[in-house]
Amino acid sequence: MQVVHRLTNQNLWPVELAPWALSVMAAGGRCIVPQEPFRPHTEDLLPARPLVLWSYTDMADPRWTWGTKYVQLRQDPFNNKPQKIGVRNTPGWAAYQLGEDLFIKTFPFDPSARYADFGCNNEIFTNEVILEIESLGPLARFAPRRVCCACRKLVTPQKSDRCR
């Protein structure tokens, strides 16, 4: 399945914008976002990527799992405290596991582009109702009547093998 997002500048003047595509997931699952490859301190002293926090994000919230390979956020219908992070996701994918099903969303990353929200091309949000996997395209200036087209490949849900 493929979803195509199109934005058209209907103004009489140019605008700067970034496409922002939300995949709204059912309650009760968890989002899985890949970490950048781990490298020992002796091999790499430079930062790997930005981690952007919103003012209501609580990194001690038990719905978060901060692992070596993945960052995970669990959706809990009994917890009404919203959580959100943004990352520069160079692998270009995020997944949602609900029971035995795994939904994978893929999106591009352009290392030469500027991204909104301190350089994020991927954000995840949850509250007591849903979890969102958000993909952001690069910031760009669009002339009147110009169309921005961003394709997002969505892989058919499949059986998962418990990502850890």
Model regions and ranges:
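Short, compositionally biased
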Residues: 162-164
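Hydrophobic core residues within well-ordered beta-strands of beta-rich domains
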Residues: 1-3, 148
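A contiguous, surface-exposed recognition patch within enzymatic or periplasmic domains that forms
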Residues: 10-18, 22-147
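Short, hydrophobic/aromatic-enriched beta-strand segments in well-ordered soluble domains
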Residues: 145-159
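Short amphipathic alpha-helical leader/targeting segments
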Residues: 19, 159-160
